[in-house]
Amino acid sequence: MFKNSFQSGFLSILYSIGSKPLQIWDKQIKNGHIKRITDQDIQSSVLEIMGTNVSTNFITAPADPKETLGIKLPFLVMIIKNLKKYFTFEVQVLDDKNVRRRFRASNYQSTTRVKPFICTMPMRLDEGWNQIQFNLSDFTRRAYGTNYIETLRVQIHANCRIRRIYFSDRLYSEEELPPEFKLFLPIQKQG
């Protein structure tokens, strides 16, 4: 999808405020919902993915299973709200051995397991809104001893609220981020 586009800085694949936040995504819903709502903490539109079973409620990009994202930027950053329920996400990458590898992070797992084609790992979320930063290059090297080439697919499962998902060429400090990539909490009125 993005293979032939110039990639530097930031590349956003989901922005909850945009006119069509799920334009490149496919939805799977069973005993749950995927909808845009207003989050009270940030007073803004977010995408909520909820379901009784994390494996049957998710969004995946690209929507076409035969396509790949082709994103070469090595950092995946997600602005996600912890809903104090089971939550998992998965990223499929291509390495320099031309092997497709998957990384799955979950808040209900306690150990990291590396198998030839999938690495599952625990993820700890703070209360409220979180910025998850995932160094795909480093994970690929540490788990498989190979080099990251590109991201093929991203899948976000229940249960969470999403503000934005983007890739970047490096980690940026809060001061360096463009305003639309920051999570602004509303100023509390003193009364």
Swiss-Prot record:
GO cellular component terms listed in the entry, alphabetical order: ciliary basal body; cilium; cytoplasm; microtubule; motile cilium
Coiled coil: none
Highest taxon, organism lineage: Eukaryota
Entry's localization field: Cytoplasm, Cytoskeleton, Cilium basal body; Cell projection, Cilium; Cytoplasm, Cytoskeleton, Cilium axoneme
Keywords, sorted A to Z: Cell projection, Cilium, Cytoplasm, Cytoskeleton, Microtubule
One GO term of the biological process aspect: cilium assembly
Pfam families per UniProt: CFA20_dom (PF05018)
PANTHER family according to UniProt: ORF PROTEIN (PTHR12458)
Role played: Cilium- and flagellum-specific protein required for axonemal structure organization and motility. Microtubule inner protein (MIP) part of the dynein-decorated doublet microtubules (DMTs) in cilia axoneme, which is required for motile cilia beating. May also play a role in cortical organization of basal body.
Family membership noted in the UniProt record: Belongs to the CFAP20 family.
Protein name: Cilia- and flagella-associated protein 20
